[in-house]
Structures are given as C-alpha cells and as structure tokens.
C-alpha cells in the first residue's frame, strides 16, 4: 500500500520534472497507469450478482450468503417489494451494496426494459456497465397429478422456469462480464420422482439440459454455467407444505441420508460457494444439494 501512495505522490508534482526532450504530460500518463494497476491490485473490482426471486426463501438466503462473502447484489422481486427492501437493508447492514428491482419472469416482453433498468442501475450505483454473476432462481411450485395438470398450469410453469430462464439470460448476457458465472436452479425432483410434480420436474429437467448447452456455447467467453438442484426445503414454496406439515416433513427426513429436511441456508451457502473464486473450474454440472435424499 505504501508503494501505491508513494507513486501517487510523484504525480502530484514532487518528482514530476521532465528530462530534456521529454514531456511532463507523458511522465504523468505513465505514472497514472502504474497507479491504476496498483489500485486494481489493492482494491479489486467489486463483484456483483443478480439474483432473481431474491426477496424471500432460497433467493433471500443466496443474497445474504453472497453479501457475507463480500459480493454486492441486485435482487429481483415480483410483487413483494416490502420484503425485497428489507433484504436490501440487511445486506447494507453487512457493509455491502444492494438494489431491488421489480421483475416478472413470466412476462418475457418485459425483459428488454428490465435489461435497461439493470444497465442504469449498474451505472448509477457501481459506475460499471457489466456484472459478474447471474442466478436464475425465481420460480413457483404447482402440485397436481399428471392427469389433473391443466394446460394453463403447464404453460405457467414453462413460462417461469424454462422459457423465463432461457430468454432472460439471453437478454442479460451482453451485460455479463467475460469470465462470469451463471447458476440455474433445478430440483432434486428432476432425479427422483414424487407424485404430483410431473410438470414442475419436467421444466427442471429442461433446465439441466439447457445448462449444459449454455456452458458449451458460453465457454468462449469463459462464462461457467451450472445447475443447483435443491431437495425439499423448509420455505413457503408450494404453500409451505414441507415446512408446515409435520407428516410431510418427517417422511422426507426419513428418506434423507442426513436425517432432516433442508433449510434455505443449505442452498444459499452452496450457491455462494459455487460462485466463489475456488469454483471457477466447475462448468456444465448439476450439483444436487439435498442431504442425500432417495439414495
């Protein structure tokens, strides 16, 4: 650090005399270049994550875990602005910067405007034109048997989980920094089967295939793409059945090697780890975070 300030002092004029035939402006330009390099060394560029559905449940946990690892966060919400603003306050109390933006991932026509909002937010809050991490987390759950699932329910799940992830990522990709990371949320239900989740699991299976294709095609930009597949988690997802129904909770725990149902922090911590500097060589993978359910 002393080197940085020593070099900066010479720019202020103490040692800025030019040799015969040399330009003082040229000397200052060279010195400024050195200082910029030192500044980048001591103060690396802050990394920014966008987390869809970050106002509650798993997305909230991801936001807080990433902030705990020194990341800044842009989180999205659909209708729960109060909850989203509360997460922003929590992150700011941790010494990090956060912004909440409204986004309906089922409304694909809104993605262009959302992309512009992200661009303006990056410029106004971070003086940047790109971000580092995208976590496609937003989603809903619909419990219905194969025979009872309606076309409307099927389309709703597809528009949010599969089509939304596909086209939102496509729209935001020009803003993702080269060497960045993308995490798509899948589900343990894409591996094991439980009655009532045929349509939901089909979308998550699609996410896992999409993840591999994205990893292949975005490799030229050194962008890694992975899928995180949670098991059953105690949240308000799907009406909070796993959290609030003791019979369901006990059954899932009995089918899990570690003997309990998952918690939001189990997933938030896993996603934060996948976005850490130590995980840059993981690419195109499905990472199940379920405590070993249905082994």
Question: Where on the chain are the PLM-derived regions?
Answer:
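Active-site helix of classical SDR
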Residues: 169, 203, 211
């Amino acid at each position: 650090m002393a080197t940085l300030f020593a070099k900066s002092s010479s720019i202020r004029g103490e040692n800025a005399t030019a040799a015969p035939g040399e330009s003082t402006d040229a000397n200052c330009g060279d010195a400024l270049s050195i200082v910029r390099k030192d500044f980048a060394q001591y103060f690396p560029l802050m990394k920014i994550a966008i987390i869809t559905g970050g106002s509650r449940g798993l997305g909230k946990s991801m936001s807080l875990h990433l902030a705990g690892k020194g990341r800044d966060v842009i989180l999205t919400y659909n209708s729960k602005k109060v909850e989203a603003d509360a997460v922003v306050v929590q992150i700011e109390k941790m010494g990090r910067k956060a912004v909440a933006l409204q986004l309906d991932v089922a409304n694909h026509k809104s993605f262009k405007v959302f992309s512009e909002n992200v661009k303006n937010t990056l410029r106004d809050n971070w003086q940047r034109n790109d971000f580092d991490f995208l976590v496609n987390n937003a989603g809903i759950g619909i419990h219905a048997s194969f025979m009872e699932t309606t076309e409307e329910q099927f389309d709703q799940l597809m528009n949010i989980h599969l089509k939304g992830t596909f086209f939102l990522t496509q729209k935001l990709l020009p803003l993702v920094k080269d060497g960045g990371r993308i995490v798509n949320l899948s589900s343990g239900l894409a591996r094991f089967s439980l009655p009532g989740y045929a349509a939901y699991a089909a979308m998550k299976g699609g996410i896992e295939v999409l993840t591999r294709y994205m990893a292949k095609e975005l490799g030229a930009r050194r962008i890694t793409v992975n899928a995180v597949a949670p098991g059953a988690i105690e949240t308000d997802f799907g009406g909070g059945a796993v959290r609030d129904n003791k019979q369901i909770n006990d059954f899932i725990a009995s089918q899990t090697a570690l003997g309990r149902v998952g918690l939001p922090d189990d997933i938030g911590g896993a996603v934060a780890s996948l976005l850490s500097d130590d995980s840059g060589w993981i690419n195109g993978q499905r990472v199940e975070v379920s405590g070993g359910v249905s082994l």
